[in-house]
UniProtKB/Swiss-Prot annotation:
Superkingdom per UniProt: Bacteria
Gene3D superfamilies cross-referenced by the UniProt entry: Ribosomal protein L22/L17
Family per record: Belongs to the universal ribosomal protein uL22 family.
Alphabetized UniProt keyword annotations: Ribonucleoprotein, Ribosomal protein, RNA-binding, rRNA-binding
Protein name per its UniProtKB record: Large ribosomal subunit protein uL22
PANTHER family, A to Z: CHLOROPLAST 50S RIBOSOMAL PROTEIN L22-RELATED, LARGE RIBOSOMAL SUBUNIT PROTEIN UL22M
Oligomeric form and interacting partners: Part of the 50S ribosomal subunit.
Gene Ontology cellular-component terms listed: cytosolic large ribosomal subunit
Task performed by this protein: This protein binds specifically to 23S rRNA; its binding is stimulated by other ribosomal proteins, e.g. L4, L17, and L20. It is important during the early stages of 50S assembly. It makes multiple contacts with different domains of the 23S rRNA in the assembled 50S subunit and ribosome.
GO annotation (BP), single: translation
């Protein structure tokens, strides 16, 4: 059985968030929470919150044992890009791209 949680439209770069996601893929859920707690990245906070939600979904909705949960899948997909304008010299303007990401975490009680 698999329980999942999705966080959408998070204001961070999907490329940088995937580096953090790779740290916890395949680990036990409680070990993954410990790793994310001490990872000094912005994405680690968001992924930890999503993982906690997936664990809560598993225990409350599917009556799974929290100690046996494993991070089965974790995906960081690209969301829409917010485009902003920054005025530059001589009447020019540059476009600033602010990326967003969708984070999906699934936990299961099977190995």
């Amino acid at each position: 059985m698999e329980a999942k949680a999705i966080t959408r439209f998070v204001r961070l770069s999907p490329r940088k968030a995937r580096l953090v996601a790779d740290l916890v893929r395949g680990k036990s859920a409680l070990e993954a929470l410990d790793i994310l707690e001490f990872t000094n990245k912005k994405a680690a906070r968001v992924i930890k919150k999503t993982l906690s939600s997936a664990i809560a979904n598993a225990t409350n909705n599917f009556k799974m044992d929290e100690d046996k949960l494993v991070v089965s899948t974790i995906m960081v997909n690209q969301g829409p890009v917010l485009k902003r304008v920054m005025p530059r010299a001589m009447g020019r303007a540059d476009i600033i791209r602010k990326p967003t990401a969708h984070i999906t975490v699934a936990v299961s009680d099977e190995q």
